[in-house]
């Protein structure tokens, strides 16, 4: 999660409406607890799997850096490495994902969930008072609006962004910079 100037930029949608199905094996069919409600990659069409055994493991955690091994969160035997690295600075957060595969052609979709509606710009996306910069020529960008029933039967809307890339080599790295500019509270909701 990333909050800037009162805006939730990168978000976790929280819990959905509690129903009997929400507490059954159908739980992950609902948007809020599903992998698609979280800012995690989709690898070869496979989302992060559900269950305790499918999770990331922290490799390094310091005041300025966090590295997570995410390979075990995916049920894809061609995926040999997936590490997610966060670097924290005063005015930006840098996110690097490193992928390694058995095969040469793979599909990587960097998936993000935002509270504020993003717009495409020259260097990537503008989200409220934050710019998410990346190499736009590497990705096909798709912005979606998702409305779901949240707690107490209220409708809530978030925006998902899928940045799709067909990887033609066995290794691939992505880099996203969240450049933070605190101007004023966004009205883009």
Give, region by region, the residue ranges found by the protein language model.
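CBM-like, beta-strand-rich accessory domains located in the C-terminal region of large
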Residues: 21-189
